[in-house]
């Protein structure tokens, strides 16, 4: 029977050691809560950190970019600019479309922003054109965020107009109602309509004008209230044949009489069922299609949203004819799930490696089982807290748990090793557990709170980067805290029941061999340490040199923002000469599609041509290239992009810009490349002067590639210069001229056909097949005040000019965005510095302002706060350690280990060819928390030896180093092996995880080697400094 030690021993662990059943049930409760939490947690690629973003689209067919800007965009911008919480407002006004993107502060709820946007639209309504076909429509979506799912709808038997009509009413509307869906767009422009193509010669011969025809059509097709009759006994509702539903009915419409004979619409026009906009088209691979892009609301969970769509699709497609085929071309969640699965596998691998290293050191199965239980229990218990905090299972939280594997095992190792030491000395297991746990309790608390202190600054990081890493930091802190609880409760209790002298002394051939090996290593370390302690100043110079080297490496290492991920989807923009027509652009697009589809890595392709709010001009096309799964192709996305661009370069007259889709989207505009730089001015003339000059210089920089600008001011314009005096004599107003031009060439929506399920438009235009180009203007006729017909050419001259194809604003002022990529041999930091240096050489006037946008702006912000972040982490840890040790000196000794970690991490990143990005910086901050553990374990035991055994400082620190060498080596290797799977990651999303693993493994290796020698030396030097300071104070007091 064991003799129990006094109740004063055991510290906070005593209660749990003495009550094994209660302790076991408590741990089972933590385990069950964690399992339930894991099943309840949503899955996503990254924490939901989107800015509240709303897009407002206004379509005004036929309007020029200048008209769209002044008549539509500007009135809306003035109202939006008064909203509180607005962070940034950008707009793009192109031919027939105005798109305004509103980005709000992170703290503003999206629903509140939505209410403000609706109120602003209502306030601007009276200022918008009266003939606007539809009011502005807003969507809770970020246009730069790639669609979560892309579907292609094709048919071999039905025209695209019928296909779109069915898809819009039976599929798109239902998907739009799913929670989390922000916007469903149908690209392809095949919305059904009745098209009226006037024969200009025919109406001129009859003395009619297009305005006469328009008035007749609008008056013949109405759908308004007619009232009802309420008699003594019955009520009767009035109805009439005031609606015309088909093209045949419109052909028979009488628009005028001549000599008593009716003139029907079919006599002067071709009337047919067609598409509302004939200058829009979409293709899936090589087949014309209706392409359905589904975008999520900012903040919505992408996995649950996509799952809901997948569940609904079968029942939606069942209602479609068999000839209509719906194909899912891309689903971003496929790669997100694969990335999360790979990270979970790496987490399991880290746990396995950590348990193996524990067995290697302890050489005892019962002793290995104890941390083998503590590690998964700590990690699983974290899931319960994550649910409470509304977190998700994503790459960052799983990375935090993977790194935590090496952290949480440290506490268990320290406890087991200390208890085992007493058992080997002959203590009974229960007494050894009480004594060892009580002795090590303060060390565990010190390790835990000093490590959590490192994570505190991450919680105060600003803007979107801070939001991004908040889940990472809190998840890691929770795992560390639960680990400390488990190590002070379950671990000593299990040691008291599972360890014994017999089990610890029981050895096999492997354990004997490993024991001898560790003894030789410790002996060699002891000899080396003795020599180092005899040459303290040389060792101190080494420590100082690591500090200097870390600063130099920090200055010269390439810096980036966020790793470029391979998500298997490439977004592309195809650019042609500015005067390109829709037919010309469609032909070029098909040529490029043929080239792209020949690449062995490409699985499918969707493309779109036309102006509809997502594409700014007719001379550009949007492409989405879906790659095969990563395990089915030989190259990663960057190599595929380079290969595709080389292949497309052979297609004449086009430029192709490609960029891989990313899980983290900070931009608010669809850009041609990954990074953006803007020039903003008070006028378009200023931009037209300086943009070409800057572009010329930027295109010569080797630090950037694929440089392009959205400044397109060479669009062909036929300027109708009306002689106002001549027009006035004939009684013709400028409104008459505009109406005649709009009727002829604006695809004017002049009437609406109402049905029970949908509404369709009647489109008026001139038939220009026989009079292409500017010659079509000669066919325009106007009605004079005396009823005569006057040709436009008699009162106006046609001048050919150039004008912008689109006009862009940023916060209500004209802006141009310059897009660029960064070549493989340069970093984003190099590119940013080169652009800033180039800008300075131009001496831009004061009314021109420049700014980086999107991820480049976030990079500048993150880079500027990084040094302060690290300083804050060090200060926080110093404060915690100072409070715990009640000393100003000992925390400095502990923190002296930090430069070695920085040197190792930065060297590893440079050797691996990785940039110092935000992921790597987080790794360095975590290293600050890890490497100081070595010093804490040494100093704790040295102080105890001085205080309790009366040892000299040199003997105390020497014995502490030898005594704690094995647990120090175990904990460091455990942390290293926890990060190793991340460093060696090769699967989906590996780009995101690898920098963290590389930095941590490199930092741990270098710091392990150096701190075992530098820490004891610095401990002794500070001890001497303290003694010298005390003697000086004592001397001054005696003299006084």
From Swiss-Prot:
Record's keyword terms, sorted: Cell inner membrane, Cell membrane, Membrane, Transmembrane, Transmembrane helix, Transport
Membrane topology term: Multi-pass membrane protein
Induction note: The mdtABC operon is transcriptionally activated by BaeR.
Broad class of the protein's primary localization: membrane
Subcellular location as annotated: Cell inner membrane
Gene3D superfamilies xrefs: Multidrug efflux transporter AcrB pore domain, Multidrug efflux transporter AcrB pore domain like, Multidrug efflux transporter AcrB TolC docking domain, DN and DC subdomains, Multidrug efflux transporter AcrB transmembrane domain
Function: The MdtABC tripartite complex confers resistance against novobiocin and deoxycholate.
Protein family: Belongs to the resistance-nodulation-cell division (RND) (TC 2.A.6) family. MdtB subfamily.
Subunit structure and binding partners: Part of a tripartite efflux system composed of MdtA, MdtB and MdtC. MdtB forms a heteromultimer with MdtC.
Record protein name field: Multidrug resistance protein MdtB
Protein species of origin: Escherichia coli O157:H7 (strain EC4115 / EHEC)
């Amino acid at each position: 029977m064991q003799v129990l030690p006094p109740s004063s021993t055991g510290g906070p662990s005593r209660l749990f050691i003495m009550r094994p059943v209660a302790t076991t049930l408590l741990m089972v409760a933590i385990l069950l809560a964690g399992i339930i939490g894991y099943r309840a947690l949503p899955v996503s690629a990254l924490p939901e950190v989107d800015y509240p973003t709303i897009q407002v689209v206004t379509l005004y067919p036929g309007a020029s970019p200048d008209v769209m800007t002044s008549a539509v965009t500007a009135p809306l911008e003035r109202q939006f600019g008064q909203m509180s919480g607005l962070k940034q407002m950008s707009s793009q006004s192109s031919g027939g479309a105005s798109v305004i993107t509103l980005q709000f502060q992170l703290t503003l709820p999206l629903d509140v922003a939505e209410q403000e946007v609706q109120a602003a639209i209502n306030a601007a309504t009276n200022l918008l054109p009266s003939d606007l076909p539809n009011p502005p429509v807003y969507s809770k979506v970020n246009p730069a965020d790639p669609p979560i799912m892309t579907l292609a709808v094709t048919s071999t038997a039905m025209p695209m107009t019928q296909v779109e009509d069915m898809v819009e009413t039976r599929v798109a509307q239902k998907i739009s109602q799913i929670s989390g869906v922000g916007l469903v767009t149908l690209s392809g422009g095949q919305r059904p309509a009745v098209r009226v193509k006037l024969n200009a010669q025919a109406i001129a011969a009859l003395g009619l004008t297009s305005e006469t025809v328009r008035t007749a059509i609008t008056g013949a097709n109405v759908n308004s209230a007619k009232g009802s009759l309420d008699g003594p006994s019955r009520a009767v509702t009035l109805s009439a044949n005031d609606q015309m539903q088909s093209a045949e009915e419109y052909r028979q419409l009488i628009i005028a009489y001549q000599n008593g004979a009716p003139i029907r619409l079919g006599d002067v026009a071709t009337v047919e069922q067609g598409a509302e906009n004939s200058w829009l088209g979409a293709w899936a691979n090589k087949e014309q299609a209706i392409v359905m892009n589904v975008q999520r609301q900012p903040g919505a969970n992408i996995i649950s949203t996509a799952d809901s769509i997948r569940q609904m699709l079968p029942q939606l497609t069942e209602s479609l004819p068999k000839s209509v085929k719906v194909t899912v071309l891309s689903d971003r969640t496929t790669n997100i799930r694969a990335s999360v699965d790979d990270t979970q596998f790496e987490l399991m691998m880290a746990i396995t490696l950590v348990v193996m290293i524990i067995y290697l050191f302890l050489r005892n199965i019962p002793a290995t089982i104890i941390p083998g239980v503590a590690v998964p229990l700590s990690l699983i218990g974290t899931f319960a807290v994550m649910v409470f905090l509304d977190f998700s299972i994503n790459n960052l939280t799983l990375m935090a748990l993977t790194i935590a594997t090496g952290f949480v095992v440290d506490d268990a190792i320290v406890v087991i090793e200390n208890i085992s030491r007493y058992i080997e000395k002959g203590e009974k297991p229960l007494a050894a557990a009480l004594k060892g746990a009580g002795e090590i309790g303060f060390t565990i608390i010190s390790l835990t709170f000093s490590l959590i202190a490192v994570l505190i600054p991450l919680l105060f990081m600003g803007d979107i980067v801070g939001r991004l890493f908040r889940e990472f930091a809190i998840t890691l802190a929770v795992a560390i805290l639960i680990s400390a609880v488990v190590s002070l409760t379950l671990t000593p209790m299990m040691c008291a029941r599972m360890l014994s002298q017999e089990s610890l002394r029981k050895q096999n051939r492997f354990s004997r061999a490993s024991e001898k090996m560790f003894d030789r290593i410790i002996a060699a370390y002891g000899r080396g340490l003795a020599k180092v302690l005899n040459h303290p100043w040389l060792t101190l110079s080494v420590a100082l040199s690591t500090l200097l080297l870390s600063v130099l490496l920090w200055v010269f290492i390439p810096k980036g923002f966020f790793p470029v991920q391979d998500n298997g989807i490439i977004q592309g923009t195809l650019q042609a000469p500015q005067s390109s027509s829709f037919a010309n652009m469609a032909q070029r697009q098909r040529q490029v599609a043929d080239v792209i589809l020949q690449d062995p890595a490409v699985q499918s392709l969707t493309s779109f041509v036309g102006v509809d709010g997502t594409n700014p001009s007719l001379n550009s096309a949007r492409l989405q290239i879906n790659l095969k799964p990563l395990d089915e192709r030989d190259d990663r996305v960057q190599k595929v992009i380079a290969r595709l661009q080389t292949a497309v370069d052979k297609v004449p007259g086009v430029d192709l810009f490609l960029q891989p889709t990313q899980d983290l989207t900070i931009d608010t505009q669809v850009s041609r490349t990954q990074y953006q730089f803007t020039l903003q001015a008070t006028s378009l003339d200023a931009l037209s002067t300086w943009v070409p000059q800057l572009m010329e210089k930027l295109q010569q920089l080797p630090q950037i590639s694929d440089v392009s600008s959205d400044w397109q001011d060479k669009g062909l314009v036929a300027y109708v210069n009306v002689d106002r005096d001549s027009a006035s004599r004939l009684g013709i107003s400028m409104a008459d001229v505009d109406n005649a031009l709009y009727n002829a060439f604006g695809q004017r929506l002049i009437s609406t056909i109402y049905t029970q399920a949908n509404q369709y438009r009647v489109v008026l235009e001139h038939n220009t097949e026989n009079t292409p180009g500017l010659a079509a203007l000669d066919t325009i006729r106007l009605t004079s005040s005396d009823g005569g017909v006057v040709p436009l050419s008699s009162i106006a001259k046609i001048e050919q000019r150039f004008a912008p194809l689109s006009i862009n604003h940023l916060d209500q002022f004209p802006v141009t965005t310059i897009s660029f990529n960064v070549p493989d041999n340069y970093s984003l930091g190099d590119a940013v510095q080169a652009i800033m240096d180039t800008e300075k050489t131009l001496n831009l006037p004061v009314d021109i302002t420049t700014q980086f946008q999107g991820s480049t702006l976030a990079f500048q912000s993150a880079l500027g706060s990084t040094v302060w972040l690290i300083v804050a982490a060090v200060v926080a840890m110093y404060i915690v350690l100072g409070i715990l040790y009640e000393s100003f000196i000992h925390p400095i000794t502990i923190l002296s280990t930090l430069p070695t970690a920085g040197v190792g991490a930065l060297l590893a990143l440079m050797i691996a060819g990785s940039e110092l990005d935000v992921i790597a910086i987080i790794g360095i901050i975590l290293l600050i928390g890890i490497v100081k553990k070595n010093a804490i374990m040494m100093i704790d035991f040295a102080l105890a030896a001085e205080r309790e055994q009366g040892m000299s400082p040199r003997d105390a620190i020497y014995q502490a180093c030898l005594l704690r060498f094995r647990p120090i080596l175990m904990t460091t290797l455990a942390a290293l092996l926890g990060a190793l799977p991340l460093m060696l990651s090769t699967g989906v999303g590996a780009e995101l995880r690898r920098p963290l693993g590389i930095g941590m493994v490199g930092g741990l290796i270098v710091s392990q080697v150096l701190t075992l020698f530098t820490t004891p030396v610095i401990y002794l030097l500070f001890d001497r400094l303290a003694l010298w300071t005390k003697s000086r104070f004592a001397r001054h007091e005696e003299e006084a």
